[in-house]
Amino acid sequence: MGKIENNERVILNVGGTRHETYRSTLKTLPGTRLALLASSEPPGDCLTTAGDKLQPSPPPLSPPPRAPPLSPGPGGCFEGGAGNCSSRGGRASDHPGGGREFFFDRHPGVFAYVLNYYRTGKLHCPADVCGPLFEEELAFWGIDETDVEPCCWMTYRQHRDAEEALDIFETPDLIGGDPGDDEDLAAKRLGIEDAAGLGGPDGKSGRWRRLQPRMWALFEDPYSSRAARFIAFASLFFILVSITTFCLETHEAFNIVKNKTEPVINGTSVVLQYEIETDPALTYVEGVCVVWFTFEFLVRIVFSPNKLEFIKNLLNIIDFVAILPFYLEVGLSGLSSKAAKDVLGFLRVVRFVRILRIFKLTRHFVGLRVLGHTLRASTNEFLLLIIFLALGVLIFATMIYYAERVGAQPNDPSASEHTQFKNIPIGFWWAVVTMTTLGYGDMYPQTWSGMLVGALCALAGVLTIAMPVPVIVNNFGMYYSLAMAKQKLPRKRKKHIPPAPQASSPTFCKTELNMACNSTQSDTCLGKDNRLLEHNRSVLSGDDSTGSEPPLSPPERLPIRRSSTRDKNRRGETCFLLTTGDYTCASDGGIRKGYEKSRSLNNIAGLAGNALRLSPVTSPYNSPCPLRRSRSPIPSIL
């Protein structure tokens, strides 16, 4: 092999788009995939070209030595030889123009930005590419996401905010066509952990496990079935009737005044006592509503998959507190003792808790949930708004107090006859009303200096409130659009995964068809480890018939859909190093948060955790410098 020249041109064919650059350019970012590719000598078993048709190079005179089995290194990584082309993630060939051409089956548009990062040292995020795709490409090329320029960081981070919002508004997603799978996934989504054991050996236990998720979804998820929609409409009806009854109880037309005066013998005076009672019709209506709420509450707590979480839920606490006073009031109404009357008076005051039932509508209306999440996500903006208002109120209340004292009479030192602003705390109320542009008119300045302060206060209030409000509105728009998109998300189905080619097939391991041999991401040929590839296909398709391999548990078969779920379910993922140099791999395989494993068939080598065998035809490459890019290891997309 000849000495590598830094000014030698290299042609990178990425997804059919050819990019031409120098080896010195690729070496500007040590530790990345392209830097390792540029630092190594051309392997001997790569394909050469004759015209436009790729042909295998002549076989070596002696068979290459077999490399020992790969052993897991730190963090679950595999270290071993990296002499052949496929282990480097690309397919190389001699180009007639004199340069080396390497083929990578990756996204060509994103690679243009990656290559510009090598040229200019600045990594920008394309605006027309989805964030997870760009993140996946950065992970493949071994580039740290923190290298993204500040001008593009917000654009790059938008997909994670969207994923978090989609997690909040998660709706039922059915991933298969089998009704049994639908029930299992629904049970898993509703909190039933043992979704795979719905039909246990005990008949009674099996019936309970089948009934529990259905009843829970019936009262908790209005979109699970038609019966659930009917229950939701009934609950909505009783909530509105209960709130209407609560409001009508305060109207004079539904109040009955009764004389409760008790005659006293030998008394010198008579004290009249009157008591207001509610119309019995409203009491009966409220009783019917309470019976429904009691039935709903008991059913939900009995069939709840997690009793502790159910009890700690704020809406459930409100529901219980709104139900309990009615039964206590009915039980104590027949008692005439003073203690019972005091308790009844307290319970009548607690009746206002019934108005909080309006928050139960958040279960049935997406808009109310959007509003709640918007308020929660805009906490910083609300805090900033309160600070601005507090500063303005303090400043203008002080200014109006001293401005209105101008022109006070000498015989009126407190200026109580001259102005309504007798002290600064009273000015707080005026400043709040003025800054919020309400203007009740109960207090107003009367001097020219006070009018000037009032005008400045109104202008400052308009500017102060106008600054944080657009951020809150944008949050609401983002949450609402994502919630609507989540609801309209089509029914998911299992992806079609073609079967593995047989050894007798004419297309088995042909280089012209770009099979697993000499592919971009594959480290082994189908003929070398067909059993491993068959197992990987069965893992991706959810098939349990993988020979001697143990079946996967139901949580492992559930699709990875969200960034938070991917972080929780990550268990020592593997990555494959390109050289035998001392390289540090993170425990999570170097895959960053929010990065989902690729579903490509060319990326599944080693998914089962079996030992891979690489057969280099050249001596392993020894890097001149230690490759320790701990923040950005070079993972295979696994």
Swiss-Prot record:
UniProt keyword Magnesium, yes or no: no
UniProt protein name: Voltage-gated potassium channel KCNC2
Database matches in Pfam families: BTB_2, Ion_trans
Residues annotated for Zn(2+) binding in this entry: 124, 130, 151-152
Entry's disease: A chromosomal aberration involving KCNC2 has been found in a mother and her two children with varying degrees of neurodevelopmental delay and cerebellar ataxia. One child also exhibits episodes of unresponsiveness suggestive of absence seizures and facial dysmorphism. Deletion at 12q21.1 deletes exons 3-5 of KCNC2. Developmental and epileptic encephalopathy 103: A form of epileptic encephalopathy, a heterogeneous group of early-onset epilepsies characterized by refractory seizures, neurodevelopmental impairment, and poor prognosis. Development is normal prior to seizure onset, after which cognitive and motor delays become apparent. DEE103 is an autosomal dominant form characterized by onset of various types of seizures in the first year of life.
Record has Transport as a keyword: yes
InterPro entries referenced in this protein's UniProt entry, alphabetically: BTB/POZ_dom (IPR000210), Ion_trans_dom (IPR005821), K_chnl_volt-dep_Kv (IPR003968), K_chnl_volt-dep_Kv3 (IPR003974), SKP1/BTB/POZ_sf (IPR011333), T1-type_BTB (IPR003131), VG_K_chnl (IPR028325), Volt_channel_dom_sf (IPR027359)
Role of this protein: Voltage-gated potassium channel that mediates transmembrane potassium transport in excitable membranes, primarily in the brain. Contributes to the regulation of the fast action potential repolarization and in sustained high-frequency firing in neurons of the central nervous system. Homotetramer channels mediate delayed-rectifier voltage-dependent potassium currents that activate rapidly at high-threshold voltages and inactivate slowly. Forms tetrameric channels through which potassium ions pass in accordance with their electrochemical gradient.
Taxonomic placement: Eukaryota, Metazoa, Chordata, Craniata, Vertebrata
PTM characteristics: Phosphorylated by PKA in cortical synaptosomes. cAMP-dependent phosphorylation inhibits channel activity. Histamine H2 receptor- and PKA-induced phosphorylation extends action potential spike duration, reduces action potential spike amplitude, sustains maximum firing frequency in hippocampal interneurons; also reduces the incidence of high-frequency oscillations in hippocampal CA3 pyramidal cell layers.
Keyword terms, alphabetized: Cell membrane, Cell projection, Chromosomal rearrangement, Disease variant, Epilepsy, Glycoprotein, Intellectual disability, Ion channel, Ion transport, Membrane, Metal-binding, Phosphoprotein, Postsynaptic cell membrane, Potassium, Potassium channel, Potassium transport, Synapse, Synaptosome, Transmembrane, Transmembrane helix, Transport, Voltage-gated channel, Zinc
Top-level taxonomic group: Eukaryota
Ranges of biased composition (kind: Pro residues): 56-72
Binding site for K(+): 437-440
PANTHER family cross-referenced by the UniProt entry: POTASSIUM VOLTAGE-GATED CHANNEL SUBFAMILY C MEMBER 2 (PTHR11537:SF172), VOLTAGE-GATED POTASSIUM CHANNEL (PTHR11537)
Subcellular locations according to the entry: Cell membrane; Membrane; Perikaryon; Cell projection, Axon
